[in-house]
């Protein structure tokens, strides 16, 4: 049995999804400290003008763990992120098949960054028929050492 663990990232790479694909169990490492300007809240997209960083706006308080970081839903840059993705990829082959749902997930009033990232990751896994048992590290802390 293979178990993998990673922090929930914003718009994960194919390598991230491959890690889930190869695992029987996947743990979202959601109980570690948030790192500003990390893959947890941003990613690169490729535009006709070159790479572009897209960053989710968050309400950050010092020394917060990932699963406590709130998204700044009043910030208009969330819509700009969706528009940037649309502009960069609208002519790609499978865009119309996947973008509408991604847009809904991102634009929904998501309170916590980790929840948004996990929603995206689980949606991608479902879309690509990637199956694994998902767990949250924060839920496992109290269970360390327990046996079934």
Question: Which role does the model predict for each range below?
Answer:
Residues 1-148:
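Residues lining hydrophobic/aromatic ligand-binding pockets adjacent to catalytic sites
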